[in-house]
Amino acid sequence: MSTHLEHDDKKDAAHDYTQQVTPADAVPSSDVEDVEVKSGLKRNLKSRHMAMISLGGVIGTGLFLGTGSALANGGPLGLFLGYATMGSICYCVMICLGEMISFLPIPGGHIKLAERFVDPALAFTMGWNYWYNWVIILPAELSAAAVLINLWNDTINNALWISICLVVVVAINFLGFFGECEFWFASIKILTIVGLIILGIVITAGGGPDHRSIGFQYWRNPGPFVQYDGISGVLGRFLGYWAVLTQAAFSYIGTEIVAIAAGEAKNPRRNLPRAIKRVYIRILIFYLGGTFIIGLLVPSNDEGLALNSGNALASPFVIAIRRAGIPVLPSIINACLLTSAWSAASSDLYTSSRALYGLSITRQAPKIFSRTTRRGLPWISISFCALFAALSYMSLQSTAGEVFGYFSNLTAAAGLMTWWGICFIYIRFEKGLRTQGIARSSLPYSSRLNYRASAAWYGIIMITIILFFSAWSVFLKDNWSTSTFVTNYLPLWLFPILWISYKYIKKTHFVRASEMDFVSGLEAIEAECHDEAPPSTILGKFWALLM
């Protein structure tokens, strides 16, 4: 990703901004603005924590396991193009979010931004949609962790493994260790994917025990694309690519978690732009590099890709390793996948509790959820969200597990609706800046690629198309599935229904561009910001480069 596409203004953003707009020029927001900047949350998350929180939220089973079925559906080139297309959308969402949240790093993240720059009704809709998304993924990740353990021991009831994982996840969040634990969890995941990419290159070049050079062999036979569902010609290849695109969309969901953590970030005006700018670049490198190597290592017609084991045996990396005759690595990779699921569950509880906290401080959830401990932990929100982890035990019973699966599947579309909302908020945000004569270059972070909200419009258009055609496969001959149709399209209709219903009941109005408040709360945010001395040692400089 070229560095000329974005720049990080090194000047003090608040100084530049106040030269253009004074408090007298701005229309103050609602009286809850004081809650934003005087919230009970504490800014305890360092730069390295912020970088790893966003990375940890997206690098996981989608890359390690989900790419297997994507390869089977689209072929090696279809796999790469699908993830590249979705990566471009992820990039646009992140630069939109980065400009806004770096300027206003407030508790509630994009939920509060929706209230401030669009409409309280959108904040209500996005907040509850986001809370549901992560509070339901939480038990799904706990169930996945138990299945991963089954690779080593399938004689013990999964309820025990779920309980152990749940206790650890709740303890991490209640004791305030989330940032530090997520840093180490995410580090393991990054080392794993980097190691797998390097190993994949070695195997492809013939460096495995069998010394067989693969090269682009599988791009020639069975070919770069898969004819989806046996449909011949260009249409079959395009449908294979589109199947990958919808799967890739769900793998990238989670990059926006950094916005929810912004209200707890130390020195946010400095650390958030750095974290956001570096995170999406690394995600694209890991995903695009990983999918390209996978397309070289495993043929798209390999029978192992059809496995539904839920553990490392279904990973295309493991399939390639076993093909190369390396016996020990599958268990090691499974251990890394287990830490990935554990990390994701911890992140899910953190994100859902902060989303609920954000709803509470905007008076769109009971006030009790905004209570915090002296250490700044929203303990009631954490406790309430942790209760939903008990849904993971539903997966132990076939009927209940099927019902739970339906709820889990709803989260994929809900995540894309969040991205759609972020892009829409940015369009209004950018409109407000232009109307009030505020230069985007005065913001702590801005991207030249997002001129006149072009990146936001690209994101909205692409996400809308993906959402409308997410369940297209059910319309193929003899392929109808009511559950697939409902779980893909229900969130698409619930989102506007919630928005319109809240707007009608509460009589809310769109915030006019000329009345948007770009001032309230800045003084407290500026007080949290300070210059940091650059590292002087070689090790320190290397660490700063990584983070």
Where are these regions (language model features)?
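TM-loop-TM module centered on a large, flexible mid-protein loop between adjacent transmembrane helices
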Residues: 112-114, 119, 225-231, 244, ...
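Membrane-interface "cap" regions at the ends of multi-pass membrane proteins
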Residues: 1-68, 72-77, 90-91, 95, ...
